[in-house]
Amino acid sequence: MARVTVEDAVKQVGNRFDLVLVAARRARQLAVQGKEPLVDEENDKPTVIALREIEEGLISNQFMDAQERIEQQQQEASELAAVAALTQDRDYGF
């Protein structure tokens, strides 16, 4: 297990307050949303994995914002496609 220090991760984010927010957000993605870790898990908890990802420069607040925007757009597109399919079925009397 690689040792993770907050100081190393702070250098990537800018300050420790933003680090807490980014790490918590990423740990939640890993633990609750089932996102795949970008580093080896090595039996680490989601918070440690999140800190390791941040320390290695793989995760940032901007990256997660962009990722969430893409997922939101994909969700909206599939909802629109479902509504269009229902509307089309209704128009043809199915």
From Swiss-Prot:
Query: What SMART domains does this protein map onto?
Result: RNA_pol_Rpb6 (SM01409)
Q: What is its EC number?
A: 2.7.7.6
The GO biological-process annotations, alphabetized, read as:
DNA-templated transcription
Q: Give the catalytic activity.
A: RNA(n) + a ribonucleoside 5'-triphosphate = RNA(n+1) + diphosphate
Q: Name one GO cellular component term.
A: DNA-directed RNA polymerase complex
Similarity field: Belongs to the RNA polymerase subunit omega family.
The free-text function statement in the UniProt record for this protein reads: Promotes RNA polymerase assembly. Latches the N- and C-terminal regions of the beta' subunit thereby facilitating its interaction with the beta and alpha subunits.
HAMAP family given in the database record: RNApol_bact_RpoZ
Q: What is this protein called?
A: DNA-directed RNA polymerase subunit omega
